[in-house]
Every structure is written in structure tokens, then in C-alpha cells.
UniProtKB/Swiss-Prot annotation:
It comes from Coccidioides immitis (strain RS). Keywords: Chromatin regulator, Nucleus, Repeat, Repressor, Transcription, Transcription regulation, WD repeat. GO terms for biological process: chromatin remodeling; DNA-templated transcription; regulation of DNA-templated transcription. Belongs to the WD repeat HIR1 family. The keyword Iron-sulfur does not apply. Residues 456-468 have a biased composition (Low complexity). This is Protein HIR1. It is found in: Nucleus. Pfam families: Beta-prop_CAF1B_HIR1, Hira, HIRA_B.
Amino acid sequence: MHIIKPVWLTHGGDRKDYEVYSCDVSPDGKRLVTAAGDGYVRIWSTDAIYNAADPEYADKPKQLASLSNHSGTIHAVRFSHNGKYLASGADDKIVCVYVHEPNPPSHTSTFGTNEPPPVENWRTIRRLIGHDNDVQDLGWSWDSSILVSVGLDSKVVVWSGHTFEKLKTIPSHQSHVKGITFDPANKYFATASDDRTIRIFRFTSPTPNSTAHDQIQNFVLEHTVKAPFVNSPLTTYFRRCSWSPDGTHIAAANAVNGPVSAAAIINRGSWDSDINLIGHEAPVEVCAFSPRLYSFSPPGKNATDNQGNAGPTLVTVIACAGGDKSLSVWITINPRPIVITQDLSAKAISDLAWSPDGKNLFATALDGTILVVRFEDQELGYPMPMEENEKSLTKFGTSRRGAGIVESANGLLLEEMSKAGEIKGVEGRMGALMGDGHPSTDQGVNGTPGDLSRSGAATAGTATPTGTQKPQQNGTPNGTPGDQEKPDPYAAKLERLKQRPTYTKDGKKRIAPLLVSGAGGTQSSLPQSRLVASSASGLAGRSEGPETVLDLSKPFDGLPKGGIAAILFGNKRKFAQMEDGEDNSVEKRVAAASQHGANPVLINEPDGLVPAAQTARELQETPEFIRPAVVNPVMAVSQIRLAVPKVRVHIVQGIDTFGNPTSVSSGLASSSQSKADLTLEARNHSGPSLTGRVTDREPSRVSLTRGDQPLWQDFLPKAVLLVTGNKKFWAAATEDGSVYIWTPAGRRLVSALVLEAQPVLLECRESWLLCITAVGMCYVWNVTTLTSPHPPISLAPVLDAAVHTMTQTPTTVPSIIAARISSQGRIILAVSNGDGYSYNPSLYTWQRLSEPWFAVASQYWNTTDSSVGDLQLARNQTGPDAAISAGIIPFLERNTTDEIVVRGRAYFLQRLIKVLLSKEGFESFEAGASIAHLENRVAAALSLGAKEEFRLYLLMYAKRLGAEGLKMKTEELLEGLIGGIFSEGEEKENSVTGDKGKNSEEGLWECESDTICGWPRRDLLKEVVLALGKHRDLQRITVPYAHLLGILDEDKNEADAMVIT
């Protein structure tokens, strides 16, 4: 055995070497990576280390690269087992992933440092954010399908090894997690924590297209080992454990055997510990099994002899180190270590790493030491080939837990079709992510292209940018002639973006960079923004933002900060106490006034009922408004009061050429705002009365102009509070509770609509007009048909009136953050407690579409499944009804997120959920809440008629049902979707021409119509069956539907056609 410690093998500093916390060896054995307190990840040549004393290697490169992508101390570095990636974790809470580029590095050493120029080109490809505290250790699965990071935030975070998406966060430990190791059979991984436990988690390697929603039943806790760590110290920096190469044992650091420090050997399966490696005087912080199995006979003599007896026993080798600065190496058949090296370093040893051949052991220490222990041949035994490792792991099998058995060939065929569709979908998303232009106009079932002939001879998964296709030799273009002849609508925009100069604060000119990879003219298949204003149809009116439509009215007047305030008065009101005067009893004052025939007016005050009194009038400056609106008498007895807007001198609102609301600013219209085409202006009189009486005021003037040219004007007897309008009509609300409506030409469409109180909100969308009064009544009118879809409705249920009306004192209730109306005349409300509501005119009741409970309990909050497809609306593909109620549900959920974060409710709700998850009986709470959230989304989209969102949420719901294996809900969902697909023509005609008609049946599950929420039921059912087809435990339900829809027959016909050709 030789110990090699080169002088140059350090993380050098100005005064001393930095502490080295971690090391690892690449799978090919040519590179050693180390991480230290200087924030650098350094990659060294192992050949240079082994031959440090050889003069011939003096001029050869020693340090291959140095990476500085962390802002603090780096605690862990690990190569992936396929040799493709390198990961590092540090106290900046970040995990960085690097990849080795074959081309030489383009940069030299950094100016002002002593760093040698890099020899290899390592590039950072991902920065993974998921921890709330220091990252202490990392581990790759043996097939490199997942990366697991652990840290001081007590979290175990699982990342995809393909896309590096966060698949799951496991909050299982109760204290700092300081070690992670993987089972070489790829069945388990174990984590060690300061809560004095090692937890074993069972997992199944996720596929490349797996998302967090597919890993619900994956990464589950198998067992918790506590016995070896009952009195273990909590002062160690690491608890780095290791799994034996034959998969039968775990070497656990920081164990105790009575008062003595030890390394515990945990047996696989029973997860007990009956063996302890005792000998260290301080806690063991790191254990490392050699990756090879060893034999005391040469590999050629390990075969069975003539009598059939087995050859020599295979053994494993383990190295342990810790705070006593010593290193011990053990062989499993010997009760004592074969070697113990003391005072190997001046401080505790932090990490150990074996070379792939099992002959070299690297060690790092907190004093900056980096060394290698080289074992001579036969000193540990004869290293066996890796095939012996594979043979020893075969006894653990490779079956998937819960995968089930395929019961028929049709079930296997359906599973293959389901997985093939998912693979095509993920290839398209990865192509869009990497900058390849994939047209998303022809999306078939499960994300597969609707017309495969357009891709020519390209194979599945081949990224073919449509903007770079070359014509063939015969002059015929690869695509269709129409596609080739059309000019690129993005070419002019890209030309304007190129070399666009910008100027900094100090006047220096800069050229804004342009992303070249995204310069294709095709649409990305990645999810786009869910919330933008409604854009006009046609190319001329398209904005530079996403084309997703929010089917809600845009408010002309911005609501005050915090929304429209509301107060609820209880039913049991008492008289207030009067402090001034001889008699302070309100009851006596009211009784005395009543004796003379008077009917005293009582006003609701915070302390109770008091007689009405004239308020003192003082001269005050009112620059922004004239006065408060006159209080309507009905306000004195109403239990709901909303804040009334003040009377302003000048009210101006405008719309652009497409009828969209826009701000009116003189010459200051920015590029993101279109200039107002029509401007409605209301002017209220602010001077003294011309007759000398207060009640005699000049009328308010309402006028419409286009630019500087007046179109029409009208006069109203009362002050105007609110105005709104679009290309179909204009409306104004006055302080006496009247609403006036004009045609675009200025003709009064109807007589004044008289309401019971002052309007506090006036919104319009297409032909619909929404008005909310100060007493909480909501009115909706169709200006075209002069009808209302429902009677006036109260906001009392939305404002929790059922809870607060029985109190004696007025109660502050949630404020109205947003009140909008959709193109279907549906009222949409968002309140300050985070709830989102919609009024259902068919049920005559409010429906809660979004609530804070789902925000903290559901795993699908503020997320969509990108494998299903985005919500980008293509009018030529989905039809004109695609914009109906689009974006309403994401809009309400976004408001819920904002409100609970701003008001601090999220913290307390998260604490409640965390406590519930640890209680008995709530093991499936998170899964149940997530399914309930998806069901609420599907029901909300169906109720609103949101076509695109209904399909998206329906497929997300189907995928979750398949992951959970819920057979009853799956069967019920398929029965609800089948509808009248296979009913007779006469029976179908009778069901459609019934009392309610086809439109009403589109919002029902159990009906005989061919469509649901604007989608053909057959298409949706086919997509759902394909999404569920990969789950074998549900194939008894899905295979009959696949036969009924002809899915399996289509695949067989395609296969037969391929054979014939």
C-alpha cells in the first residue's frame, strides 16, 4: 500500500489551503473531482496523481478544469454513473449540473488569478433550485435516471436525470440530512439524518418523459432504521453512508455500539444491524464500499470444480474515516481491519472515493488534504469483473412494483401505443426547448402529429426545422407549396429586433443581444403564458405577446388598492351610547321624537344605532374629486355596504380600433399600448350653483370624440360616477343609481335603468353589461337583446354573510379585488381572502372555482401538464368557440396565490398541511386533495364552457387517476365521456331536440349528445383511453373501450399496410 500526496493537489489560498469537503472519481477512472471552501470544483488528472513522482509527467497537465459557479462553500460533487454529467451542491442552496464538451475550451485562465488554463471544456447546463438551506450530499442512481440531493433543510429532493425537472420533494426527515447512497440494484436509496435515523426509500426509475405528476406512488418510504443511532452524536459534518456492490448491505456512518463509535452494517430486506465496525475513537463520518467484488483466487479459478462445488467466496471491501483523522479498511470476511492509518490528516476526513478498478482510494480532509491510497495487487484480493456484480444483483430482480401483469396481447399493444404517444410528445417539447421549430398546428391524439406524411422521410423524433428545409433535386419543395410560398410573418419583426441599440443610464450605447435559436417562424409547443389581454383577430392586430385569450372584461377604472371595501352589519343591532348632552340614552331620544309624530332616522354606526345628524361642513381642498356621492337612503338599512366611488370632475375612457380598452394619454402612448381611437368623456360641474341653491347644479356632460373630432354629446341631470363602453354601446352610471346606455352613434338605447343604490362597479364585454351597486346587488344585461340572464343577485354569499350576520357589531369582510364579466355573460369575482367565484345562471347560485385550500394542499396548483399541450389558441384549428371563458380559471388561481402570499395565510396553511400529513389517518391526504383540485378544475371548465382548458384538465385528471389506480372513478369517467357516441340516429335526434337543446347538453356528463364542452366525445374518449393505457391494473377497463373506439384495429391496419408495402 502506498500513500500519494502531491504538493500541487490542493485548493490553495493566500494563507492556507481551503477545506476540501468532497471528492469523486469518474466512471472511466481518468478524472478526480474535488470541492472545497474556495467555491471551486476542480477536476484533476488521475494519471498525473498516480505518477506524481515520475519526472516524465512533470510537464503534463495536472488540473484539467476549474469551475466556479457557486457563491459559497461546495459540500458535494458526484459524477453520474454513465459519465455524462457532473453535479455539485453548495451552501448557496443550488445544485449545478455540468457536462463535458468535446471541443477544446475557448477561454484561457482568468486575469488576476493563479489558475492554470483549462485543458477540458466543462459547461454548466442546469442550476437546480429546490432547497431552502445548504446542500450537504448528492447521489446518482446507477442508471443515472435520477439525481437526489439532501441538505440542512431536512429535505430530500429528487431530480430527473434526463430533463433535471424536480420530480418530488420528500420531507420525511425531522432534522438535517447529511448523507445519501443508492442501491446498485436500482431499487432503493437510503438517506442519513441528524434525527438519528436512516430512511430507506423504494423507487422505480422514471422514464425520460416522466413528470412530477407521474411520480405520486414513486419514491415511497420503505423502512426507517433507528437502533444503531439512538445515542449517536449530532456534531458530525457528514453522515455519508455507502451501499455494497452486491446490494446486500449498507454501511452507515455515525453509529454507536454502547459508548463506542462505530460504523453499522445494515442488512438488506430485514433492515436490521447485527454487525458493527468498531475501532475509531471519534464518530465515523464517511463510509465507502469498493465498487468491485474481490476473491482470494485468480478470476480464472473461480469456476466450479469437477465435483460441482462452488468456487471461492466473493467478498467486499469497505473504507471508513471520520473525526479521529484515521482511515480503516475492512474486508467482510475478517473481523478486524486489514489496515488502519492514523493521523492521515490534521483535521477530520470528509470524503472517500474509490477508483472504478478498486485499487485506489482517494481521501479528502478539512485541513485541505487530498491524497490517494494505492493498493498493490492481491493486497485486497483479486478484483472480479463487473459481470460478477451483475450476477450478484440478479437475485433482487428487475420487476416494477405495482406494474402488474399484462393479461392479453391487446393490453400490451395499448400500453405500447400509450408510451409511444408520450415519447413523441416529450421529443417535441425537448425540440422546442432546444430551439428546434416544431409546428404545433396539427396535434393528433396524445400529442402525435395529425398528418405524418408532411414530415417526409424523417423518422420519429427527428427535429426538422420548417424554416430551413431545402428543395429537392427535382425542384419540388419538401413541404406543401402553400407553406413554402407564404412569406414568414416574423421576418420583418426579427429584422427590427436585430442590432437594436439601447442606452444605459450613463449614456453608453449597447446592442441588445438576440436569441438566434428561437428565430424560427414556427410556434413553440411549450406552454405559453396563460394570462394576457384579448387580442384582436387578424394578423394586423396581433401583438408581440402570446396569443392566449383572457375572456374577461378589462376594467376601465382601476379598483382602489386592496379592492372595494365591504362591511356587513348583523341582524341584532343595539343603540349606541351618547356621551354629550344630559340624556345619553338613544332609546329615550327616539321615544321623545316619536311622541310628536316624527319618525326619527337611525344610522348604523360601528358602535350601534344613532340618530342622524347634520355633518359639519368645512372648506377643504379636493384636487382629485369634487365630493363623496350622495348616500342613498337604502344604505342606512342594508346589511351590506360597499365603498362608493367619489364624484370626480373629469372621467375619460377610451377604446382602440379593435374595441379593446386602452388608456388615454396625450402623445405618450408606448409601444405596448395602442392609441385610443374613441374617447368617452364625462365632465361633472364643480363650481357653485348658478341659482344659489345647493340642489340646483349644472348638468353633467357626456361626449364621445375620435381624435379631436366630436361625434356626439349628451347631458345628464346627476353627477356621473362610472363610465364604460365598447364598439357596440356606451354606458354611464350616476350617483342617484341610474344607468344610461347609448348606441355608438349616441342614441339612447333604453330609458334610464333605475337601481336601488349607487353603482360602485360598471363593466362591459361584447353585448353584456355588469353593474354592482353599493348594497351588493349584481345586475347583468344583454344590451343587444335587452334581456337579463337571471334576476339581480346579492353578493352576500360571497362575502360570508351567513357567518357574520348574527353578530351585533359591524364586521369587515373580504374586499372585492376584481369583478369581471365574460363573453357569455358570466360574472367572475375575485375577493381578498383568495377565493374566486362565478355565478351559474342555470343553478341560480354562486360557485367557488378557486380557494386557498387547494393552493397549499394540491400538487397541481398553478401548474399545467405540458405533455398534454398548451392553451395557445389557434383559431383556424380549434374554431371560434375556443376563446369562450378562456383563461378564467388560471386568472382566479393566480389571484388566490397572490392574496394568500400577500396576507400571510400561506405560511399558516402550509404548517397545517404539514402537521396533517404526519398524523395517522391522513396518509393519503395530499393525493386526495390533488385529485379534488383536478375534479374542481374539470367541473369549473365544463360549467364555464372553457373548451381548451376542459381538455387540458381532463387529461391531467385521467393521468392522475391512472397513477393512483382508482378503478371506480376511471370507469365512471369513461362512462360519462361515451355519451351518445354509439346511440342510434333517431334516439340521438330526439335527445338533441328536447326541451333544453344541444347547447345545454354540452355541459352535462350523462347525456346523449356527440359533444361535450365543444369537443367531440369520441376524440376526448380516445385521448383518455390512450393516457390510461399504460397502467396495467386498469387495462380490464380501458381495453374494451379501445376495442369500441377502434384504436387497436387502427394500429393493426397500419402494421399490415407496412408489411404489404
